[in-house]
């Protein structure tokens, strides 16, 4: 039970940091590919 209760406290910040990083990386690659800037 202790591992299950401590799982969200590790999983939520991980998703909160990894997901925006992947979104920014894919967005920057898309901008470089289309060469808007």
Curated annotation (Swiss-Prot):
GO terms for cellular component: chloroplast thylakoid membrane; photosystem I. SUPFAM superfamilies: Subunit VIII of photosystem I reaction centre, PsaI. It is a single-pass membrane protein. It is found in: Plastid, Chloroplast thylakoid membrane. One of its GO terms (biological process) is photosynthesis. Keywords: Chloroplast, Membrane, Photosynthesis, Photosystem I, Plastid, Thylakoid, Transmembrane, Transmembrane helix. Pfam families: PSI_8. InterPro entries: PSI_PsaI, PSI_PsaI_sf. Signal peptide: none annotated. May help in the organization of the PsaL subunit. Belongs to the PsaI family. This is Photosystem I reaction center subunit VIII. It comes from Gossypium hirsutum. The gene is psaI.
């Amino acid at each position: 039970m202790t591992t299950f209760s401590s799982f969200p406290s590790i999983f939520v910040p991980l998703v909160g940091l990894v997901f925006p990083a992947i979104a920014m990386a894919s967005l920057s690659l898309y901008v470089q590919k289309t060469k808007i800037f």
